[in-house]
Amino acid sequence: MKGEKQVFGTYEWAVSNANFINGCFHNCKYCYSKEMAIRFKRKTALNWDIEVVNTIQLNKRFKKADGPIMFPSSHDITPVNLPSTIIFLNNLLIAGNDVLVVTKPHFEVVEKICTTFSNYKNKILFRFTIGSIDSKVLKFWEPNAPDYEERKKCLVYAFNNGFSTSISCEPMLDDKADKIVLDLQDYVTDSIWIGKANFLIRRLKMNGLTDTTTIKKANDLIAMQSDAKIKLLFQNLSSNSKVKWKESVKKVVQLEISTVKGLDV
């Protein structure tokens, strides 16, 4: 309906978000949550990678939401916080919720979640963030997150163990999203989401990353995501039924943007 507010970000995927940690060890350079934490003085650029568990949130008893809940949205799941993650995820699931587990996956983490929650396969959808097929690119932008091979191993493991799987290629970290689709689509039961790097220079500056190398790579990445190149990518992948487009791409190619939270379309 005309005048209704378009949804973007995590609300394209879920009706609400759930988190229990302030900070993130992965310390991704482009991180929106880091930018917000610094802006509102909850963290600094220097201590963002030090994770602090919110024990009240960790022990929260959830109600059943009217749609999928994304977990986590402002931090990630690592081997260090895995024991607490199991508690928190269990609290979400026992309330009957459908949970979208979004992570730059560590194999130890995915293996543990799959074995612990094997009876909840119909309530969990994994969404593994993979912005490049090149581990060197991943290492630059996501310095403490797993390399490409480990992320692929996690996807294959979850798929082979009967879990629903999907990929977030948002942000794209180079101009090779089509190679990610080609290499991983056979292990995806749900969808492969593709999106641009949003507000990249602004976020890098807020996150304290203004060195010459980072800014140059950021400008190179922005150039890779010009409207012309996005339209070409869309043309090449639009016939693939597993590929979905984030709001940042939909604007460029003039696709309708949802006004309803959590439709995952």
Spans of features found by a protein language model:
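Conserved AdoMet/S-adenosylmethionine-binding subsite of the radical SAM
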Residues: V53-N236
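N-terminal [4Fe-4S]-dependent radical SAM core
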Residues: M1-P68, V252
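Generic ordered-secondary-structure signal
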Residues: W13, K43, S73-D76, T103, ...
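C-terminal accessory regions of radical SAM enzymes
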Residues: A228-V265
